[in-house]
Amino acid sequence: MEIKDLQCNIFIPDPLSIKHMKIALVRDLTNNSFGRQATLLEKGLKELGHEVTSFEKNSIRKEDLPPGFDDYIYYTIFNTQLFWKGIPKHGKNIVFEVADTDAISSVALYFFRHQPVDKIIVPSQWSKNAFYTLKLPIPQPIYVIPHALNPSMFSYPPKEMPHPCVLAILPHSWDRKGGDIVVNVFRELMNSGYHFYPLILVSNMLEPRLRGLNAVKTPLPDPDYYSLFAGCDILFYPVRGGAFEIPVIEALALGLDVVVTEKGAWSEWILNNDDVYWIKVNKKVKLWYTNLFHVGYFLEPDYNDAYQKLVMALANWHPEKKKENLENRAILYRERYNYINIAKEWEKILA
């Protein structure tokens, strides 16, 4: 079976098996990570036979949301007008939120105790656990549903890159994404004579710690981003925290090898423990002291182990490695995180 056979996984619903739902999706309409996930959710729910109307979460007020919908999905709500001033009770209210650290603040939890929220959805057990760290009461059930892969990412031709190309993704949150470990490991490997092409995606090209390293400014249009992504061979991702970190499963679905921190939210969605090179974690660290919502600790990847695991990935790389990955495990990730499969999980909770 060729990979391209899975690229157009069109789901045709049975009209007799569907309970048609009218859904208001209150979301970020910009092309950021949550905006893209909300777009995939909307697309999936519509293809399952439901009516979905989107509202811009950053500008809409409580009194502006109209009645008449069965479900109101708030796709991330922290620090919006709706968070500070409340949400209406027209239908069933479902809030999707995340936890970048291992604890959600009392300010965030106050919202869930005093607003008419019926259900909470998070993208990982890590995020779910963070809601309970402070041991404050939470009246709603919390469900875990992973993010979806963008099906169009598989249609872009891989960019011609020097091989082996090791990719690091640092578009924001330098400390959380492990930027210090990335640049230091890259430099140490280069100084030791290892043959590889390091590439870092960053938002700030003036970052002084990038001096002497290959960097590309982000954000990029999807065709450019995924072509570059698919052209690389190894994702080096010594991340410290995050609620899901989709580059990990994107890399596996594109055939890359992955070197990533153990124990975080992303580790829950690896289909086989041997699919990645795990960086050991020795302790937790506090990095954020002024964040209103994410008040817990991050994981601290072991620097020496990060170095050694990237060395192992480079030692095991060969020109046919990508082809082998694409013909085997990549297929499994594309199917598991297909947007229709994820929309079906949402559908069960909305019903």
From Swiss-Prot:
Protein name: Putative glycosyltransferase 45
An MF annotation (GO) of this entry: glycosyltransferase activity
Keywords from the UniProt entry: Glycosyltransferase, Transferase
Domain of life, source organism: Viruses
Gene encoding the protein: SIFV0045
Top class in the EC scheme: transferase
EC annotation from Swiss-Prot or TrEMBL: 2.4.-.-
Family the entry assigns: Belongs to the glycosyltransferase group 1 family.
Taxonomic lineage of the native organism: Viruses, Adnaviria, Zilligvirae, Taleaviricota, Tokiviricetes
